[in-house]
Amino acid sequence: MAKQIQAIRGMNDILPTQSPLWQKVEAVLRSSVSAYGYSEIRTPIVESTDLFKRSIGEVTDIVEKEMYTFEDRNSDSLTLRPEGTASTVRAGNEHGLLYNQEQRLWYMGPMFRHERPQKGRYRQFHQFGVEVYGIGTADIDAEVLMLSARLWQQLGIDEHVSLELNTLGDPSERAAYRDALIAFLEQHKDKLDEDSQRRMYSNPLRVLDTKDSQVQALLADAPALMDYLGEESKTHFSTLCELLDAVGIQYRVNPRLVRGLDYYNRTVFEWVTTSLGSQGTVLAGGRYDGLVGQLGGKDTPAVGFAMGLERIVLLLETLGLNQDIAPEVDVYVTAMGDSCLVEAFKVAQELRQALPGLKVMSHCGGGNVKKQMKRADKSGAAYAIIIGENELANNQVAIKPLRNNNQQELVARDALAETISALI
């Protein structure tokens, strides 16, 4: 017997029993961005490696450790996309979408990072993101946060997530703060863990995001970024907070929030939850006004966020919110004998045409009454439609409830669609 081939570690199948919850989440995401007037963009999953080195930053965990990179037959270095923003900017620059234009975009699709697989985090994961280009004011920052808050409300998890905010200032302000932070870290170099020592000069702001408890305690005395901000950056952040207050979105200012990607400036934010054990991020984003220019376009203000669908699905399952999912099948049509098969197929097709939203499954493969009823029950359908020789002779069909103890009833053939419509 040949050896069975299995999925690559960290790359999971989404099985038929799981897909209805995924479809529900995806439908909520699509309807929410549509309500705000955003347009979908779809980009390739394979890009030039240089795109991510220039956007994410070479001294980041993603580029150094996590990217799936390979050479193609032309010896070009290619990478499976680890996130969606860089690809969206590349597409915008390439097709002239961003030149003196405002764009409100969204995307959804698979991304790839060679991380240690764990529950809710996989090497192939599905990401949903929102990107806005051409608007540099705080009101658009507030809008994308309002949109994200709407997602939680629509999914029924708004009581289980909370918003954290910070501002990183502009590049010159951050450079001044960077120097002050390096000077502070140099004084305490012997107390830093290996990762923090490595990042101290190459990417010192990432030290603020350390998980090492000893370094976290040390950072309590570190310089505060807020003290290095100019009036324009302070006004931008205070306006954002004022707008969020006005629409009732609660938040906490977290001065240690810096995000893991190099391209952010000014506003950064995360939605976090404690419902998955230790505090975990379920959505993150911010402003990246320099990225479009960094990737060869004209300097363009931009803001956006991304979220991993696996984490959202896991959160819904953990909270028990995966129970009330519409069944894949509403009615299951059976034929009791070969002589009834043609009529059963006609009935199923007529139902689909008369009731386009109805999910109709026809029994195939023959079998006795017991086998067909077992299949009907397993399908999850609410009703079985039974066509036997007696029903055929009397121009009737039988409707059998599968999810309650109500009695089976006979209805006229031409009244079936109306009857089913009233029942479902």
Swiss-Prot record:
Out of the domains of life, which is the source? Answer: Bacteria
GO BP of this protein: histidyl-tRNA aminoacylation
Q: Where in the cell is it found?
A: Cytoplasm
Query: Could you name the Gene Ontology cellular component terms for this entry?
Result: cytoplasm
Q: Which UniProt keywords apply?
A: Aminoacyl-tRNA synthetase, ATP-binding, Cytoplasm, Ligase, Nucleotide-binding, Protein biosynthesis
The EC number on file is 6.1.1.21
What Pfam families does this protein map onto?
HGTP_anticodon, tRNA-synt_His
Q: Does the keyword Iron apply?
A: no
Catalysed reactions, as listed in the record: tRNA(His) + L-histidine + ATP = L-histidyl-tRNA(His) + AMP + diphosphate + H(+)
Q: What Gene3D superfamilies would the database entry show?
A: Anticodon-binding domain (3.40.50.800), Bira Bifunctional Protein, Domain 2 (3.30.930.10)
Q: Which GO terms describe its molecular function?
A: ATP binding; histidine-tRNA ligase activity
Q: What NCBIfam families does this protein's entry cite?
A: hisS (TIGR00442)
* Family the UniProt entry places it in: Belongs to the class-II aminoacyl-tRNA synthetase family.
- The protein's assembly and partners: Homodimer.
- Protein name (Swiss-Prot/TrEMBL): Histidine--tRNA ligase
* UniProt organism field: Shewanella denitrificans (strain OS217 / ATCC BAA-1090 / DSM 15013)
Upper taxonomic lineage: Bacteria, Pseudomonadati, Pseudomonadota, Gammaproteobacteria, Alteromonadales
Q: Which gene encodes it?
A: hisS
